[in-house]
Amino acid sequence: MDNVIHTDDFQLEMGTAEIPAGQEERRRAERQGDGSAGECQSAVRLRRPERRQMAMVMQCPDDLVSATHPVRRVAEVVEHLDVSGFCQPIKAREGVAGRDATDPKLLVSLWLYACVRGIGSGRELARQCQENVAFQWLCGGVSVNHRLLSDFRTDHGEALDRLLTQVIASLVDKDVVKVSRVSQDGVRVRVGAGASSFRREERLEKLLDEAKQHVEELHQRLDSPESPVAAVTAKQAAARKRAARERQERLEQAIAQLPELKKRQEEAATRAGQGKCGKKIREKEPRVSTTDAEARVMKMPNGGYNPAVNVQLATDTESRAIVGVEVSNEGSDSAGLSAPMRQQVEERTAGKVEEHLLDGGYLRTQDIEEAHEQGVALFVPPKPARNPEKRGRELEPKPGDSEAVRAWKQRMKSEEGKQVYKQRAATSETVNAELRSWRGLGRITVRGLAKARCIALWCALAYNVMHFATVLLG
């Protein structure tokens, strides 16, 4: 009878196969034990991984996640949405040669669930699709790469805007969202541009001349057959040309921003007057980032100054749903951002905003009078008086007050107005905190306001889908 060695997973017959190298010594060491505690101690029995053991696994992809997993809710909501706006740029059509395009519903589901999980990178999402069972369940065997995911995330601004409108309209139809009272707040989000990438006009002009010269020299070197650089592949040559061309384009975009910045600077100096403040503003030269021309240095919540964008969010105070999204490079909320947001909310919901809650940074007499003419009651606190003796008397009527200003002061002094205004912090502040902490709005790594707005729309969509999935599916 042949000798048989009993192992954890199989029996190896001597004579029919060889003992794997090192296995006999390992088994002997296990039988002998450590020996440090004495010969009478029993051998330790352990379950060790057998990573070379072949096995046949039969599994249905639908069994990867449980029936109550949140990813199923995201997929179900997307199945009920109209994503035809994402299909228009697709070139793969019936009767036309070419590879089939990836279903936009899959890509929408992937990015929505990525925002739910706080993932804000195309490479990280592609990695999760390889390693995470929830994302594997969403893919259902369809392969995706980081370039496809990143392009889809920022190339469909209009379709994303319509998708958010579609979700909000569904909530309005189900009588969940009512925009009679809306709260608005801005959150400054750090962008990818570095603080040292900001340059003045003289330096930008010099860099642009150098970039143009570099593009010309690069084309000559790569296109010349006698040049040693011509030995690079066509793909490498195209990549070098593209990088040089994109740098030149970024510098041209930065220079194109200077007239607008100069105009704003002159307006700020005019408001400051001819004193020291106005003189200080006039002496300062505007600077633009060579990485992201539309980014601006803003004062952040931590008190520091960093390149950022201003993400404006409007929230329904009753349902806490996000009903408006806008992105600007205005460092101050007092730059007339309330009226455009009110108009956007009314267009999305076909409703009428009657009460608009704002923090003190939005206070402008012009906005108060404009809202009064439209029949909208603004709830915004006054700015504290500079004179300590006059603090607490900011809402007292003055001889030159207009009818709109008098109505606003009376409204903010009343007990009813104070109770209404308390809802602003309970809605806008908590929604902003959730998007920054859990929905991927902590930092924006794309360049330009248009792409930054796409990121904000994805985050708002993920927020609404997660909080109102039951209503949307009902």
Question: What is each of the regions a protein language model found here?
Answer:
Residues 2-28, 32, 37-44, 48, ...:
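Anion-binding and metal-coordination hotspots
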Residues 59, 89-96, 106-114, 321-328, ...:
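Glycine- and acidic
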Residues 60, 78-83, 103, 145, ...:
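Poly-acidic low-complexity segments
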Residues 83-84, 93-104, 128-141, 146-152:
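Helical catalytic core of nucleic-acid polymerases
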Residues 64-112, 117:
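Basic, short loop/linker segments at the boundary and entry of helix-turn-helix/winged-helix-like folds
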